Amino acid sequence: MSAAIVNAVKQCGYFNQGQCLSCRHIQQPLAQQVAVKTQTLLQLLAPFIPANSAELFLPPITGDDSGFRNKAKMVVLGAAHEPVLGIVSPSGEAVDLCDCLLYPADMQALLHRLTRFVQQAGLPPYRVDKAKGELKFILLTRSQVRGEYLLRFVLRSHNGIERIERELPALLAEYPQIKVVSVNIQPVHMAILEGDEEIFLTENTRLEERFNHVPLFIRPKSFFQTNPQVAAQLYQTAREWVAEFSPRSLWDLFCGVGGFGLHCASKDITLTGIEIEAEAIACAQMSAQMMGLENVQFMALDSTDFAKGKSAADKPDLIIVNPPRRGIGEALCQSLSEFAPKAILYSSCNPKTLAKDLEHIQGYHLTKVQLFDLFPHTDHFEVLAMLVKD
């Protein structure tokens, strides 16, 4: 990234007018944002860093400060004849976010087209204040490898499906890059993004992405990183760090669609991936098959329960953990300490819970830490930490 881009300040009309404050640090240069995040990380991990060992903190990895996001979660507001895709502003107004700077230009254009789609279909937006209407959210995910899309309509009931199906052929003819379309039924009058029922309106049910020549698949309910540019560097770094230990066996806990494990896998490595979301596991299995990996097992289980059910004899050479914001928890920390693999690679989206977990992982020391700025203009970031057995 050039210094000119790093030191520029993004001018966002939504933020300047107080309509959307999600990117709370957008008026700071990206370099300054990353410096603050780095200092936060240093302070949190200071208790685990030996004196004169600052070199284990590697330079932070950054990407573009606009056009990087691959997922849009749009609240549908307004009325059927004049829908608005975006958010409710702090003052309570409906704000159209189709031109949000975080989205690539082609994604912005498609969001505008989807606004017209809602209008043409006559889909009444759900009114929270009156508990009436049908269309709650439009969720759009973009694959960078081909610029293809997964489109989801979140409805209160089945009543709007026929209207969507009526207008869908024209939309798909205009945008053949929309490969997956589904309807999610969320009948509850609560601030819940999605329900249990997913109805596919296309034959294809998954979107293909590719990082560092590793095929990954996205289904409607599977978690996927929202910043492909930096995520690819995160996975590649993990691959390089793990390779230094030449493991013959790996566990990838909280594996999602398998991004970390599949990057580190080879035909000589036995890989076990654990993830509670069955859709994500189905995606990981598909990737492994496409890569021709045979010594791979992905299972839809709770990671902590999986570890509790294993004995020391089952331990792998190396364990990867990539938990949600809550961290891995004390019970799993204890299991990892008892298994005592050669190394533990911890990818964290919440350095506070990373620090808390490090207190409970016994018999290990940090050898490398690196910050990945997957979430520019916010307080959030990803951390990769390598722990090696004492």
From Swiss-Prot:
The keyword Methyltransferase applies. [4Fe-4S] cluster binds at residues 12, 20, 23, 100. InterPro entries: 23SrRNA_MeTrfase_RlmC, MeTrfase_TrmA_AS, MeTrfase_TrmA_CS, SAM-dependent_MTases_sf, U5_MeTrfase_fam. Pfam families: tRNA_U5-meth_tr (PF05958). GO terms for molecular function: 4 iron, 4 sulfur cluster binding; iron ion binding; rRNA (uridine-C5-)-methyltransferase activity. Keywords: 4Fe-4S, Iron, Iron-sulfur, Metal-binding, Methyltransferase, rRNA processing, S-adenosyl-L-methionine, Transferase. The keyword Lipid metabolism does not apply. S-adenosyl-L-methionine binds at residues 225, 254, 275, 322. Signal peptide: none annotated. SUPFAM superfamilies: S-adenosyl-L-methionine-dependent methyltransferases. One of its GO terms (biological process) is rRNA base methylation. Coiled coil: none annotated. It comes from the Bacteria. It is an enzyme of class 2 (transferase). Belongs to the class I-like SAM-binding methyltransferase superfamily. RNA M5U methyltransferase family. RlmC subfamily. Catalyzes the formation of 5-methyl-uridine at position 747 (m5U747) in 23S rRNA. HAMAP family: 23SrRNA_methyltr_RlmC. This is 23S rRNA (uracil(747)-C(5))-methyltransferase RlmC. It comes from Shewanella baltica (strain OS195). The lineage of its organism: Bacteria, Pseudomonadati, Pseudomonadota, Gammaproteobacteria, Alteromonadales. The gene is rlmC.
